[in-house]
Amino acid sequence: MNTADMESLATTISQSKLKLYKRALILAQITIFYNLVEGLFSVFFGLEDETLSLAGFGLDSFVEVISGVGILHMVRRLMRNLDTNPDQYEEKALRITGFSFYILAIGLILTSILNLYRGHKPETTFWGIVVAVISIFTMWALIHYKIKVGRQLNSEAILEDANCTKTCLYLSFVLLLASVGYKYTGIGGIDSVGAVLIAVFAFREGRESFEKARGKSCCCD
């Protein structure tokens, strides 16, 4: 292969990589915007209807925003420096995602304890059902495309962000089951056990993010 062919191949690879980074950027922007809207909506109606699970779900949406911002920052820097080793940027993004998982786990456990302690019953769970259904479809689509782009770029940070979104998908199912369960049984603490299980999952994913970040740090060294 002569020099001209090598330069042409390098240009093609760079263009392909840039296209994938643009997709990752759009996914991060959608994640941030959607979760900001969902978080504000959920917290407002959660407090309005005294539905702790919905309010807690809204706070968890803000955690997803943190992870999305980390990915957004990483992708923008990599788009400006396509030939740079992405490990140093991915390490920071993985740590941000790891912290997001830990915050999510703590928030879920505290919300569950508060639910059980107060034995609180919401006025209505209608908005919880609406938010959960919309969130399930949105999170599923985001997970699908984040995993696809993450694998194509071989980016552990984007794949971990997909796991963060997956945790929110599971939480959406818990919110839906809790809202429907309360509607038909009147038991206010139905979601507590499921929320604790998700908290355990979130903690494990957070720990894995930090382990991968340490691996990236070693590679950088």
Residue ranges, per PLM feature:
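Alpha-helical transmembrane cores and adjacent cytosolic helix/loop segments
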Residues: 2-221
